[in-house]
């Protein structure tokens, strides 16, 4: 044990009735990013995930497959663990409810609650959902008797069972939730749970006799413990409640249980009431995240829209998947999964903004300084000095904003802060123009300062982005010529950390650009409208020759795209605001929406016809034209590495 503050975070333990889908990947990526962040922020972290392996559904699945339940779960749990490895999940423990350590804890706590008088024998007659492993009282159902959580038909069951006195603790639960408003998050989930309890809390069936795959009730072995009393206890088992009292003393209570919104009820009502009965401190927070949806619908096998993460990981890599999920989905809300948006995000944020910044920064260090960094001196040039001071200030401000976002469970806000800084570094290149400084030996200290600021800024980015893109972050760190990445933390993020004389190690592009065109076997299922085959393009006729004087009438400039958005009711048009330097901006409308996502254009430098007469397109005045090349139905915009306003000759 050490003196660091502790942080205990858990995912749900996933049910091995089938392969995991992208929604499970989302949940575990969130938890992993928080665990990594807390480690970098100086905490002793215990990060738990696992598998919930008992219950009637598993028993039935195993029987259908002609194997024993443990043989059935062993195979699928192995797939879980392989997925987490490929996703680069940094869990400290993986608990299985079939492990002996867990069986011992469940039986001990069941006995304790029984001895207290909070568990009694009775007969259960009512409605049961096999897939969800949940009982439903009549007052929570509609006339169709379908599961309120999953929508499947419920089974009417009648059997001897043990019951847990949930109703006894309803008032105490309500008082606790009112006095601890941060216990259930986000607030919308808290309000839902309060209304659920206000509508009436019935005692909970906590044992079954109609199947045998489960942990035996210690004083009545013909009963097995109901799966939720079994599963929820895993958080105590892994924390060492029986086997490691020092560990348990340090890490319990859990700081956060991260769960999908469909199991918030079990974690925020059943679980805390169980702990009240057992005399164990409640977790500090339960956070219920939203669902990932595809084509506007929740994923389900019956709809054929379940997204398998394995092909995506193989095609795009874990960092790209993690970044997209955590950046594009507002935590706590449902979010739509889109392959096109994933590719757009890779191209715009990871390839263009981050990857190109690192590559061109290190290329200039290699070209102008033979790969060696020196801090230099920017004081001799007012523009460079001011821009450099702004980067130093923004680095500290970004770290503060990033930490605030992560601590506030606003991961996408934290990432936006980091990528705003990345774009500021890209802008810094345009303002300071290191290629121009390199032409004048007298400006060598200025060039050194600019190159150092770019690399030191990337050092900040590397550590801040590590919770979300850990593989790329370590590559950035190593390419900057730094070592001991595993032991770095946020205390190291003080400006000036790269020592004079550091040799950079430029590598290949971090995130190669992905072409938008997709094959028919794309791993993300979606509804696709059949397109008519394209008509063969006619060979273009040669244009009439023009004089050199006519050509020079065209004023071609480099323009930086500041904003970009699709034009409403148009499939082809994107509206952009571009900068021509010296504070001059223009609005331009371009027919490139079929080939580029708006977000991947922002920050790009393009060739712009600046003296074209304005024309209205879809009611928007377009004040120029962006040049593009087309052939055989494809189109590409040439991007250039020159400052905005540069004349094209």
Question: What does each model-found stretch correspond to?
Answer:
Residues 2-49, 96, 101-105, 131, ...:
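Structured secondary-structure scaffolds
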Residues 72-128:
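A broadly conserved sequence feature marking short terminus-proximal activation segments
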Residues 112, 128, 135, 146, ...:
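The −1 position to Zn-ligating cysteines in a subset of zinc-ribbon hairpins
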Residues 121, 127, 328, 333, ...:
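Helix-rich, typically C-terminal accessory recognition domains appended to large enzymatic cores
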Residues 123-125, 141-144:
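Short metal-coordination and nucleic-acid-contact micro-motifs, chiefly zinc-binding Cys/His arrays
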Residues 136, 154:
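Cys/His-rich microdomains that often coordinate metals
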Residues 476-550:
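Intrinsic disorder at enzyme termini
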Residues 530-649:
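Phosphate-backbone binding interfaces of nucleic-acid-interacting proteins
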């Amino acid at each position: 044990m050490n003196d660091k503050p502790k942080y205990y975070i858990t995912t749900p333990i996933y049910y091995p009735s089938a392969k995991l889908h992208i929604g499970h990947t989302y949940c575990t990526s969130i938890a992993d990013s928080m665990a990594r962040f807390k480690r970098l922020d100086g905490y002793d972290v215990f990060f738990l995930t696992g598998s919930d392996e008992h219950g009637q559904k598993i028993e039935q699945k195993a029987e259908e497959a002609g194997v024993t339940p443990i043989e059935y779960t062993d195979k699928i749990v192995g797939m879980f663990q392989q997925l987490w490895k490929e996703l680069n999940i940094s869990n400290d423990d993986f608990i299985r409810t079939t492990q002996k350590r867990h069986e011992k804890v469940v039986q001990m706590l069941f006995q304790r609650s029984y001895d207290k008088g909070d568990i009694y024998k009775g007969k259960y007659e009512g409605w049961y959902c096999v897939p969800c492993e949940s009982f439903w009282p009549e007052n929570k159902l509609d006339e169709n008797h379908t599961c309120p959580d999953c929508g499947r038909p419920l089974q009417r069951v009648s059997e001897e069972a043990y019951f847990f006195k949930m109703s006894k603790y309803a008032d105490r639960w309500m008082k606790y939730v009112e006095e601890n408003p941060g216990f259930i998050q986000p607030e919308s989930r808290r309000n839902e749970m309060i209304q659920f309890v206000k509508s009436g809390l019935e005692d909970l069936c906590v044992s079954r006799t109609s199947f045998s795959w489960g942990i035996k009730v210690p004083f009545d072995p013909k009963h097995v413990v109901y799966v939720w009393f079994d599963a929820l206890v895993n958080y105590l088992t892994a924390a060492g409640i029986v086997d490691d009292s020092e560990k348990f003393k340090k890490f319990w209570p859990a700081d956060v249980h991260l769960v999908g919104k469909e199991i918030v009820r079990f974690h925020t009502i059943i679980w805390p009431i169980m702990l009240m009965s057992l005399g164990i401190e409640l977790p500090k927070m339960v956070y219920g995240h939203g669902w990932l949806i595809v084509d506007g619908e929740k994923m389900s096998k019956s709809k054929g829209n379940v997204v398998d993460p394995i092909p995506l990981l193989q095609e795009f890599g874990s960092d790209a998947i993690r970044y997209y999920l955590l950046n594009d989905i507002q935590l706590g809300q449902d979010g739509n999964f889109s392959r096109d948006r994933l590719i757009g995000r890779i191209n715009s944020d990871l390839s263009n903004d981050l990857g190109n910044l690192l590559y061109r920064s290190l290329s200039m260090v290699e070209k102008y300084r033979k790969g060696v960094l020196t801090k230099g001196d920017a004081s001799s040039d007012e523009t460079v000095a001011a821009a450099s001071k702004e980067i130093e200030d923004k680095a500290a401000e970004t770290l503060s904003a990033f930490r605030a976002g992560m601590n506030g469970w606003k991961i996408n806000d934290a990432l936006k802060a980091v990528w705003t800084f990345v774009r500021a570094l890209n802008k810094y290149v345009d303002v300071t123009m290191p290629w121009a400084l390199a032409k004048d030996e007298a400006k060598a200290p200025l060039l050194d300062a600019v190159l150092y600021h770019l690399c030191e800024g990337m050092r900040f980015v590397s550590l801040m982005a590590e919770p979300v893109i850990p593989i790329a972050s370590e590559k950035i760190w190593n390419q900057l010529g730094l070592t001991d990445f595993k032991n770095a933390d946020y205390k190291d993020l003080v400006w000036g950390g790269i020592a004079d004389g550091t040799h950079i190690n430029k590598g290949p592009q971090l995130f190669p650009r992905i072409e938008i065109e997709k094959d028919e076997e794309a791993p993300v299922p979606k509804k696709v409208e059949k397109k008519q085959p394209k008509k063969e393009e006619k060979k273009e006729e040669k244009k009439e020759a023009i004089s050199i004087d006519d050509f020079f009438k065209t004023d071609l400039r480099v323009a930086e795209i500041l904003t970009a958005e699709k034009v409403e009711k148009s499939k082809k048009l994107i509206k952009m605001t571009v900068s021509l330097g010296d504070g001059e901006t223009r609005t331009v409308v371009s027919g490139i929406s079929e080939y580029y996502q708006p977000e991947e254009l922002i920050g790009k430098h393009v060739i712009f016809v600046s003296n074209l007469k304005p024309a209205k397109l879809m009611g928007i005045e377009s004040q120029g034209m962006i040049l593009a090349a087309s052939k055989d139905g494809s189109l590409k915009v040439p991007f250039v590495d020159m400052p905005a306003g540069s004349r094209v000759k």
